[in-house]
Amino acid sequence: MKEKSQVADIDRSVYDIRDKEDDAYRMQEGLTPEIIDKLSKEKDDPVWMQQFRLQSLQIYNEMPVPDWGPSIEGLDMDHIATYVRPKSDMKNDWKDVPQDIKDTFERLGIPQAERKSLAGVGAQYDSELVYHNVRDEVAAQGVVYTDMESALKGEYADMVHKYFMKLVTPRDHKFAALHGAVWSGGSFVYVPKGVQVSIPLQSYFRLNAKGAGQFEHTLIIVDEGASLHFLEGCSAPKYNVANLHAGCVELYVKKNAKLRYSTIENWSKNMYNLNTKRALVEEGGVIEWVSGSFGSHVGCLYPMSVLKGDNSKMEFTGVTFAGAGQNLDTGAKVVHIGRNTSSYMNTRSISKSGGISTFRSSVVVQKGAKHAKSSVSCQSLMLDSESRSDTVPAMDIRTKDAAVGHEAKIGSISNEAVFYLMSRGMSEEDARALIVSGFADNVSKELPLEYAVEMNNLIRLEMKGSIG
């Protein structure tokens, strides 16, 4: 009998191609005040940011490692380089990007996607953006889409100072404090009042450096009555040492505004993905999260929505695929503060080859959140007896005038369904891949076509060789 292939050994093709490490600058490994000072000087931070970084480091050193969730014992910050500057500064014209970096992003389809269906693109390589551009017609609407470094030091400096790490503070948890100390790169977006951005903006993050971390900061403000769809993609080649991603996303959705934030995460399976995402939604505002998590060795990701305004809404649609050697602990959180607020979580988790998938949901309804409604649905698919799937719901309801529900289901692939598809001419492997793709359809149907195709390809890649 042929030995069953392991997901961790599958060739991830374009994602796992490593570039030669030819950095302009690589910070020494570890976390000390001297290293943070050096980073701040390297980036020419304003004084308030220099102080913020050092304060965040102090908080990081004081805070304990979370005592719940997956083990992160394999992550040693003394062996992580927190800043790696590529040899190219940021370009606004694709042809000016160095050829080797350009080749990497072209393999990932970034310039093609920009030409076909995006209003603007930011591409980050290790710790800094190497490309950033927005269409003229979008900029003419007053939409600001730039890198965080330019926003921090340029004409939007006051806005950055007002919003930066106010929603996610360094005291939230240890890795939020780490982010505050060493953040670099990321995107800044401001959509003016009443502006409807009809096609998405996208940022793509690629970590090529071995034994390094990526700590980009994304700050988006969608003003009153405006709307935006923002796409985020992530990948890295696999190494035999730990890499770390501890980015931060802060989203401000103003009165009657709407923001959809879509993510396809395909980190390599030596990655610790400890990301923090949060949205603050004002009266009548809508936040929609669409999330696909396929990579990393350990993943902890729980986008949080604070429904501050009356009649504000949140929707979270997610899929997680945990294969061999993966422990993906994901979910979503919502806090209902305003009256007549509503939240809906609809997730799918898939585990195979001993992978562990955990879904955590947290619903908090404050005392004044009269007539709040919340629905949580989690469905899990285990493809073998070695895998594991857990659901950990938490509810804190402080008013009687609320309707809150939770539903969880765990199952396996029906042999009858596989046999039926095989009778129609499909191989067993293709039949199982098709069933799993259909199970994850809740996310793929919410994505633009190119990204839905990429997600389904990732599922097929993970399923390859799963039949012994």
Residue ranges, per PLM feature:
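Non-catalytic terminal regions with compositionally biased, polar/charged low complexity
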Residues: 17-21, 43
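Extended intrinsically disordered or low-complexity segments
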Residues: 14-15, 339
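Conserved beta-strand/loop scaffold segments within soluble protein domains that form the structured core
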Residues: 131-133, 137-426, 440-468
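Short acidic (Asp/Glu) and glycine-rich catalytic loops that position anionic groups and cofactors
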Residues: 18, 33-37, 396-397
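N-terminal amphipathic, basic helical "cap/leader" segment at the start of enzyme domains
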Residues: 2-6, 10, 25-172, 176-177, ...
